[in-house]
Amino acid sequence: MSWEHHERPHIVELGTKRGLFRLTKQLPDLVWNAAALEGNTFTLPEVRTLLDAGLFRGEGDAEGDGGGVRLMDGGFIPFDPADELGEAHADLLVSLQGLDNPVEQALAYFCSATRSQFYFDGNKRTARLVASGLLLSHGYSALNIPHARQLEFNLALDELFRADDATALMDFLYDCLEESSQ
């Protein structure tokens, strides 16, 4: 996976304490946007109620049979073989160390983890959580991808999967992060 390195918006560094405070305040919105992007029909007030009450948990086992990613135009991109994912993830972590900018590291992780499908399920959710953790640890806001921008997000994802080019997705993510950092 590659992307064009060009001038992108400056993301304001808030400091870790302020970033965590904002995360706490924005959590219902972050959760609702993530769920809505995947077709969940909960309303924002319902998400707030569930988070406040702690009414969520995951149980059980998960098994998969391979699979792939369905594109907006109906195309299909098969997953990479499972036995190659561990090495690919290790290679990704090494390559991220070569990036000086923690924002670029976090967003590149999101793009690569989403493209490689490292996780059995919830790849975009998991990649967004890891990217947000990296951002917060360096004093930036968490990554929020607004549901209102779903079409733009899906088009950038299609480009990522079809051409193995993360340029459009990196630009989109930088824009989302700049928006959520204000």
Task: Label each PLM-derived region with a short phrase.
Residues 1-182:
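FIC/Doc superfamily catalytic core
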